[in-house]
Protein backbone atom coordinates (compact mmCIF):
# COMPACT_ATOMS: atom_id res chain seq x y z
CA UNK A 1 0.00 0.00 0.00
CA UNK A 2 1.29 3.42 -0.92
CA UNK A 3 0.62 5.26 2.37
CA UNK A 4 0.48 2.44 4.95
CA UNK A 5 -2.93 2.45 6.63
CA UNK A 6 -3.43 6.20 6.31
CA UNK A 7 -5.34 8.32 3.80
CA UNK A 8 -3.27 11.51 3.56
CA UNK A 9 -5.40 14.00 1.60
CA UNK A 10 -2.40 16.11 0.59
CA UNK A 11 -0.84 13.10 -1.16
CA UNK A 12 -4.02 11.75 -2.74
CA UNK A 13 -4.45 14.81 -4.95
CA UNK A 14 -0.86 14.51 -6.19
CA UNK A 15 -1.25 10.82 -7.01
CA UNK A 16 -4.59 11.40 -8.75
CA UNK A 17 -3.06 14.21 -10.84
CA UNK A 18 -0.29 11.92 -12.05
CA UNK A 19 -2.84 9.20 -12.84
CA UNK A 20 -4.91 11.70 -14.84
CA UNK A 21 -1.82 12.91 -16.71
CA UNK A 22 -0.76 9.36 -17.55
CA UNK A 23 -4.31 8.35 -18.49
CA UNK A 24 -4.75 11.30 -20.83
CA UNK A 25 -1.44 10.53 -22.50
CA UNK A 26 -2.58 6.94 -23.04
CA UNK A 27 -5.90 8.25 -24.43
CA UNK A 28 -3.99 10.55 -26.81
CA UNK A 29 -2.25 7.44 -28.13
CA UNK A 30 -5.62 5.87 -28.90
CA UNK A 31 -6.01 3.38 -26.06
CA UNK A 32 -8.96 3.05 -23.69
CA UNK A 33 -8.60 4.45 -20.18
CA UNK A 34 -10.84 3.98 -17.14
CA UNK A 35 -10.51 6.38 -14.22
CA UNK A 36 -12.02 4.92 -11.07
CA UNK A 37 -11.07 6.95 -8.03
CA UNK A 38 -14.07 8.90 -6.90
CA UNK A 39 -14.91 11.95 -8.96
CA UNK A 40 -17.13 13.14 -6.19
CA UNK A 41 -18.10 16.42 -7.80
CA UNK A 42 -19.50 17.52 -11.13
CA UNK A 43 -16.57 19.91 -11.62
CA UNK A 44 -14.06 17.03 -11.41
CA UNK A 45 -16.02 15.02 -13.94
CA UNK A 46 -16.55 18.04 -16.21
CA UNK A 47 -12.85 18.90 -16.21
CA UNK A 48 -11.88 15.37 -17.18
CA UNK A 49 -14.56 15.17 -19.86
CA UNK A 50 -13.27 18.47 -21.27
CA UNK A 51 -9.62 17.37 -21.20
CA UNK A 52 -10.53 14.04 -22.82
CA UNK A 53 -12.22 15.97 -25.61
CA UNK A 54 -9.14 18.22 -25.91
CA UNK A 55 -6.92 15.18 -26.53
CA UNK A 56 -9.38 13.69 -29.02
CA UNK A 57 -10.77 11.01 -26.73
CA UNK A 58 -14.39 10.08 -26.07
CA UNK A 59 -15.47 10.17 -22.43
CA UNK A 60 -18.33 8.59 -20.56
CA UNK A 61 -19.47 8.99 -16.96
CA UNK A 62 -20.63 5.71 -15.45
CA UNK A 63 -22.39 5.82 -12.09
CA UNK A 64 -23.23 2.74 -10.05
CA UNK A 65 -25.28 3.88 -7.04
CA UNK A 66 -24.91 2.07 -3.73
CA UNK A 67 -26.86 2.46 -0.52
CA UNK A 68 -25.13 3.25 2.76
CA UNK A 69 -25.57 -0.20 4.30
CA UNK A 70 -24.05 -2.03 1.33
CA UNK A 71 -21.21 0.49 1.11
CA UNK A 72 -20.43 0.06 4.83
CA UNK A 73 -20.52 -3.75 4.41
CA UNK A 74 -18.05 -3.59 1.50
CA UNK A 75 -15.72 -1.15 3.27
CA UNK A 76 -15.70 -3.32 6.40
CA UNK A 77 -15.12 -6.50 4.39
CA UNK A 78 -12.32 -4.93 2.35
CA UNK A 79 -10.47 -3.84 5.49
CA UNK A 80 -11.03 -7.23 7.15
CA UNK A 81 -9.79 -9.25 4.17
CA UNK A 82 -7.07 -6.99 2.72
CA UNK A 83 -5.98 -4.48 5.39
CA UNK A 84 -2.62 -4.03 3.65
CA UNK A 85 -4.41 -2.62 0.56
CA UNK A 86 -6.78 -0.14 2.20
CA UNK A 87 -7.25 2.04 5.26
CA UNK A 88 -9.75 2.03 8.09
CA UNK A 89 -12.85 4.23 7.60
CA UNK A 90 -15.05 5.19 10.52
CA UNK A 91 -18.82 5.53 10.19
CA UNK A 92 -18.42 9.29 10.71
CA UNK A 93 -15.88 9.56 7.87
CA UNK A 94 -18.02 7.50 5.54
CA UNK A 95 -21.08 9.66 6.28
CA UNK A 96 -19.09 12.87 5.73
CA UNK A 97 -17.77 11.61 2.41
CA UNK A 98 -21.22 10.47 1.28
CA UNK A 99 -22.58 13.94 2.10
CA UNK A 100 -19.89 15.56 -0.09
CA UNK A 101 -20.64 13.39 -3.12
CA UNK A 102 -22.57 15.00 -5.99
CA UNK A 103 -24.24 12.22 -7.98
CA UNK A 104 -24.26 12.79 -11.74
CA UNK A 105 -27.61 13.78 -13.20
CA UNK A 106 -29.19 12.23 -16.30
CA UNK A 107 -27.70 14.87 -18.63
CA UNK A 108 -24.19 14.21 -17.38
CA UNK A 109 -24.69 10.45 -17.74
CA UNK A 110 -25.91 10.97 -21.33
CA UNK A 111 -22.73 12.90 -22.11
CA UNK A 112 -24.48 16.20 -22.67
CA UNK A 113 -22.60 19.44 -23.22
CA UNK A 114 -19.92 20.12 -20.63
CA UNK A 115 -20.96 23.01 -18.38
CA UNK A 116 -18.96 26.25 -18.41
CA UNK A 117 -15.80 26.39 -16.32
CA UNK A 118 -16.35 27.98 -12.88
CA UNK A 119 -15.97 31.78 -13.17
CA UNK A 120 -12.71 32.02 -11.23
CA UNK A 121 -10.91 29.87 -13.85
CA UNK A 122 -10.06 30.55 -17.49
CA UNK A 123 -10.23 26.92 -18.68
CA UNK A 124 -11.13 23.47 -17.41
CA UNK A 125 -7.44 22.63 -17.77
CA UNK A 126 -6.55 25.40 -15.33
CA UNK A 127 -9.27 24.21 -12.95
CA UNK A 128 -7.93 20.65 -13.14
CA UNK A 129 -4.31 21.68 -12.54
CA UNK A 130 -5.41 23.48 -9.38
CA UNK A 131 -7.56 20.55 -8.23
CA UNK A 132 -4.74 18.07 -8.92
CA UNK A 133 -1.49 20.03 -8.31
CA UNK A 134 0.70 17.47 -10.08
CA UNK A 135 -1.36 17.77 -13.30
CA UNK A 136 0.20 20.37 -15.61
CA UNK A 137 -2.03 23.00 -17.19
CA UNK A 138 -1.04 21.71 -20.63
CA UNK A 139 -4.46 21.85 -22.26
CA UNK A 140 -5.00 25.60 -21.72
CA UNK A 141 -4.21 26.45 -25.33
CA UNK A 142 -7.20 24.40 -26.46
CA UNK A 143 -10.51 26.26 -26.52
CA UNK A 144 -12.51 26.20 -23.29
Tell me the role of every PLM-derived stretch.
Residues 1-31, 77:
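Conserved substrate/cofactor phosphate-moiety recognition/catalytic segment
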Residues 22-23, 48-50:
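Aromatic/hydrophobic pocket-lining residues that form π-stacking "cages" and hydrophobic walls in ligand
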Residues 29, 55-60, 106-112:
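Short glycine-/polar-rich loops that comprise or flank the Walker A/P-loop
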Residues 36-48:
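Acidic, metal-coordinating catalytic cores used for nucleic-acid/nucleotide bond scission
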Residues 3-6, 54-103, 140:
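A glycine- and Lys/Arg-enriched "phosphate-lid" helix/loop adjacent to the NTP-binding pocket
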Residues 99-144:
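NTP-dependent small-molecule kinase module
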Residues 33-36, 61:
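Short catalytic-loop micro-motif centered on adjacent basic/acidic residues
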Residues 42, 69, 121-122:
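Loop/helix-junction capping segments adjacent to catalytic residues or to phosphate/diphosphate-binding pockets
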Amino acid sequence: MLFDDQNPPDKRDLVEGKLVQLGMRVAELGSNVVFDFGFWGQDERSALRWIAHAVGARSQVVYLPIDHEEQRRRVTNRFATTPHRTFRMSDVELEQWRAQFQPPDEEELRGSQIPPVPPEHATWSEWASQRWPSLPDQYASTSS
